[in-house]
Amino acid sequence: MKKSLSLVLAFVLAMTMLVGIASAEEGKILNIWCWNTEFQSRFNDYYPEVKEIAEDKSTTTLNDGTIVKWTINPNENNNYQNKLDEALLAQESAAADEKIDIFLIEADYALKYVDSPFTLDVRADIGLTDEQLVGQYKYTQDIATADGVLKGVTWQATPGLFAYRRSIAKDVLGTDDPAEVQAALSDWDKFDAVAEQAAAKGYKMLSGYDDSFRTFSNNVSAPWVDGTTVKVDANIMKWVEQTKLYTEKGYNNKSSLWNDVWAADQGPDGKVFGFFYSTWGINFTLLGNSLADSNAPAEVGNGIFGDYAVCEGPQPYYWGGTWICAAAGTDNAETIKDVMAKLTCDKDIALAITTDTQDYTNNVEAMDELASSDYASAFLGGQNHIALFAKAAPNIDMSNAGPYDQGCNEGIQTAFKDYFDGVVDIDTAKKNFETIIMEKYPELTEVVWP
């Protein structure tokens, strides 16, 4: 009897071990969800394990045979989040090769996913160590932390600067030197004065209504929501006042972020003094918009490549950023660990990304090294803009970030566009914002204005 029981126990133990091994075995399909090709490009270009990329870029094959399947759903009208949410809710019942393994999130809605059961603990579940993570900028971890648990990591840090046209600065201020231009734009009163000077010369200071929004919204005194009350910060209303003034005086071109007018204003025929941009915007958007021929080499002689420079501007701010999250239910934890470690913790890879693309990477040591080097951006006329980013990045404060940021930020800009256009008065714009918020977030009960 004892012998039989021992055999049974041995069999059960063996089966348990086999099940454990099977469950720990890495899947051969790595499903990654994102909203554009930015991370896909970084992954394909800089993850050392990439072996082959499909011609249509729908898949990437790794050295161990793992096939990365890319699902890219554009952000427009909340499309990305809607489809992601639907897939995550079905994650438990999905076949192993259909489960999401990695998905990307943005700062404005990071807490929605970070503070949820759909994301894994980067340390406890994935296995990254404090030693690996210590070199990242603190704010990038603060954004992706809930109840002390880190749920996402990023390869980039996104402090903001003011990118201006050198040729226009020379015409308006008599200089294009970043230090001298910064002295002329170091607070909002000075910024407004230069806007008046620029208008007298036939230029617009900004392209449109939303350009300066992040600079104001990142310098608020409290989060958007307190309990169930939306509290509109006084600094948000300063943005409203400035934008209305600029519109009435012709200091902007009445464009909206991402529309065709806004993009054209950054190009060869543009007459706009400058644009508020964070790190990704300079290399991912502004550079592309500056070219006369997008199919020709990005170099001096193609459009206004080389005619931009950057300075700190009137207030420090950050804008955007993309975080890598491991999805609960993944069978690729070890692969995800390696992806996160290589793309967000490796100094040499961080240096390569920044040197090649001008993206500002999330490695303090690497960025400080470039900041003090002879690194020069040809796009920015030979300027070492990394030095300005390195100065700004450690000071980014995420203490006022919250789960309602995306809806409130987008809602206030949408509601007040009609006010800037002269279609409604300010009281109607306020009521329209209240309607947008109450419809989007039924749990919120009131909006308080300063």
Language model features with spans:
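Bacterial N-terminal signal peptides
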Residues: 10-16
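Hinge/lid segment of periplasmic solute-binding proteins
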Residues: 92, 103-161, 189-192, 298-312
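Helix-loop-helix "hinge/cap" segment bordering the ligand-binding cleft or interdomain interface
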Residues: 125-134, 142-212, 224-256, 328-334, ...
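Conserved N-terminal structural module of periplasmic/extracytoplasmic solute-binding proteins
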Residues: 6, 19-111, 130, 351, ...
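Long, aromatic- and glycine/proline-rich binding clefts that accommodate carbohydrate-like moieties
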Residues: 303-306, 354-418, 446-450
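Periplasmic-binding protein-like
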Residues: 42, 166, 341-370
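Short helices/loops that flank or line small-molecule/ion binding pockets
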Residues: 81-99, 103, 116, 169, ...
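Extracytoplasmic/periplasmic substrate-binding proteins
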Residues: 48, 238-338
